């Protein structure tokens, strides 16, 4: 478990010790098992923060979990940062991952804005559950 300690610690952007992040984790990390709590956090981040790929702030402040929570929205990277932070606040080891992905569900407006359907630097979260890293992408709201 000592090897997982870095994946439980706060960082400048994964500000898991921030009061708002801790409160969100306490409110939403419900369930009998760690997996149940992780799924509850995933759903809360995915559906509780509106996906908005048109407001991108790459500053340190703009990339903080606490900032995305305060704004109630974010694009894939801040939403992944939030899930990583609230998981850590709930005691679930978590880390960020990035990949270039082709999004066949993107809107015409987004494809025109990006001039492609490839999402470069798509952010996701990896959660340590049941002895392995599990990928979770909370970007796109269920609705």
What are these model-predicted stretches?
Residues 68, 72-75, 117:
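Secondary-structure capping and boundary motifs in well-ordered enzyme cores
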